[in-house]
Amino acid sequence: MPRHIVCLTFDFDTMSGFIARGLTTPTALSRGEFGARASTRILAFLQSRGIRSTWFTPGFTIETYPGECEAVVKAGHEIAHHSWAHVPPANQSREQEEADMERATRPSGASLATGRAAIARRRGI
């Protein structure tokens, strides 16, 4: 039987996208809460099938839902950079984008690898 390789990713945005667009009513924010609730179900499904994945997670989500994000890592999955609060970089100045990258990286406790991004080198992160 042929072997297939698949890259499975999730955008674990929770309510960050709503906040980035200024949608901070209880209704908008409640829609963003489902991602954190669903993460437990997704992790159980992935574990039952022995599947590993990458979760693109904004820093806001890591700070707001640390337990859920820790569960992702403990289950053997990767958390990847996904900005601070899902603000499109095209709408940011260079300085705003740099500040967003730095702010998004800190909650994870990670540092960006040398040479990976010019912004990281300039900022010393």
Give residue spans per PLM region.
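Catalytic alpha-helical scaffold of carbohydrate-active enzymes acting on polysaccharides/glycoconjugates
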Residues: 1-118, 122-125
